[in-house]
Amino acid sequence: MLNPKKKRKECYFAGILAAAAAISLLSGCCGGTPSLEEALKKTASYEQTSIPSPASDSLGGQWTVIALARSGEEAEDGYYEKYRANLEKRVKDQEGVLSENRYTEYARAVLACKAIGIDPSDIGGYDLGKPLDDFEAVTAQGLNGAVYALLSLNADRLEIDGELEQKYLTYIVKQEKPPGGFSLDDSSDTADVDLTAMTLQCLEPYATEEEISAIIDRGVEFLADAQAEDGGYEAYGDKSSESVCQVILALSTYGIDCNKDERFQKKEKGL
């Protein structure tokens, strides 16, 4: 099993890139300032230098492809083509099976394909979105499986299966922990920062629904209460920049200014 601390470190810069891009959409959250623009450019350059040939897995550059495409920063010539070639090779080599039990592999690939404007339904002759139709297999992985399946369904809203969408939404809503937030651990009564932030991101298209709006509000309050005194977050006993990035993404999704909202200012220190 992959050490969770190592995984968080590997995803760190991709998370920063995505979070910085999200912040830039908020005029009151340092958007458009030279320092933010410089951070975007430096991180985008670092990611592409560190991962010159992005692979189709969570640690090999797939998150980089997603974050880079969404950031608005220009990719190097042929960068996305390399990703597609690597993805097609993996799909063909494995006869369309990215994983037997981790269906986030399919959701992440669909998100990456849609982010760079290619059709995930024909990659090496395989439809990468098809496995996500298997509700039982996806949710067997847990809450994160359903969250990323719903995110991938909503990535472009084209030909979305409304019945399947509702099944995932209903499943996710039922996983809320009292008094708010979400966790990967079904047996836990305590919510988790990362899973709560991820789940809030996938609930945004439904924010006008009264029940969902209340869940979102409770989730945001949980994230505010879980924030450390230095303005950051901890995971596995260590300070976690990835958790900070996930929270920034979640807040930005709802137009919440992470640098001005009083709930996220701890001793004059914010995200």
Where are these regions (language model features)?
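N-terminal secretory signal peptides that target proteins for export/translocation
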Residues: 1-9
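N-terminal leader/targeting segments and the immediately adjacent pre-domain N-terminus
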Residues: 2, 14-15, 30-34
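Sec-dependent N-terminal signal peptides
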Residues: 9-22
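C-terminal motif of bacterial Sec signal peptides marking the signal peptidase cleavage site
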Residues: 25-28
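Ser/Thr/Asn(+Pro)-rich, low-complexity disordered segments
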Residues: 30-33, 71-74, 82
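N-terminal amphipathic/basic helix or basic patch
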Residues: 31-42, 59, 63
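Long, well-ordered core segments of solenoidal/helical folds
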Residues: 35-54, 78-98, 120-140, 163-183, ...
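An alpha-helical repeat/solenoid feature that recognizes helix-turn-helix modules
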Residues: 52-75, 97-119, 138-166, 177-215, ...
